[in-house]
Amino acid sequence: MPAFSRRLTAAFAAAFLLLSVSAVLAAPKSFASSDDAKEKDEPQKFLPDYDKLVQGKDADWVYFPKGSLKGTYKTVMVKDFEHNGKSRDSRDAARDGKEYAEQWLEKEGFEVVEKNADLIVEGNVFNAWEPSGAARYWGGWAANPGVGLELLIKNKSGEVVGELRQKAKGSTVPDAVENGLEDMCKSVAAGK
């Protein structure tokens, strides 16, 4: 009998350990507990709910309170992008945001309009960088130009239906903006 209870106890302990580990692995990683949230030079002032962002499929961080937007909404209007990054590169990257967002939202099946849209997309560039000096030549892919982007998506009544945050790299800053918005628009269509 004691051997049976030891085996039973060991089996319960193993099952408990498996359930505990699987619960931890299954929980989506949140932005608030990530290293990205601790970056001092990347403002977190544009989106209303940074604590609700979770790791996304295509975009780095996403929050869609009602799931996928593609079937529910048909038309979209993209506003000019803002920037709260401190560099000139951030300002320049913000100029490219609207055009690339419209391009990729159309490719995902949304109709881009100038007014009376089902969805209103607001964008922000929170950081943009261009490597300097020898880093550009000796740093490899890690030294490519990059950009940090945020999208706030509202329906026509002003209710937030999506928030996204993404860092992307490219051969130039405009290329990084396009790469980031491509991933973000895929997430908008999929709702994850």
Predicted regions, residues:
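Sec/Tat-exported extracytoplasmic proteins
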Residues: 80, 85, 97, 101-109, ...
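Extracytoplasmic/periplasmic, Sec-exported soluble proteins
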Residues: 70-73, 85-97, 141-145, 168-180
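Bacterial N-terminal signal peptides
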Residues: 11-20
